Amino acid sequence: RSCLVGSEMCIRDRDTTIAILSGFSFNKRVLVQGYHGTGKSTHIEQIAARLNWPCIRVNLDSHISRIDLIGKDAIKLKDGKQITEFQEGILPWSIQNPVALVFDEYDAGRPDVMFVIQRILESEGNFTLLDKNKVIKQNKYFRLFATSNTVGLGDTSGLYHGTQQINQGQMDRWNIVTTLNYLSLEKEMETVSYTHLTLPTSPK
């Protein structure tokens, strides 16, 4: 699938579009669930591009650790001397900036890591950075989205080995859960015809 930023052909599902726009407009946490290759992450990116909203995607695979999200102590040079300084991870940085953070493969994250993002699932939830004894307040334009193949109950189809069951207390914190699956034949023809105007818009 090839989509340019701002491409009309990538925004073809009305319900998903409304759900994502609600997330941006009303600061709601939106989880987009669906089969692989349906354009879940791309859909969010395309809408963010139209709104001129910076968008960051993080693949939440099993190798992502708490340190990757929160941050860690790093050795730096300051005035010609080596010092140890805490370097914030992607999560504290995103919270403090007007960006849309997208967690890809949300249901593949390690259970112990998932609880790190529990607090920021609240639209006004502050984030306590214990390593710096600091409470981080969310930027009013910070937005949080996620994509997953399952709805948090594990893989019952056999298609998505490696996905996890998600704590239902955390699932309840998502304000909107929408589904984006494969397009119907008519919709696919309409999408292809949009970029190839000589093709018919419906199958015969």
Regions found by a protein language model. Name each.
Residues R1-G6, H196-K204:
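Single conserved hydrophobic/aromatic residue that forms the stacking wall/gate
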Residues S7-Y194:
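AAA+ P-loop NTPase catalytic core and its hallmark functional loops
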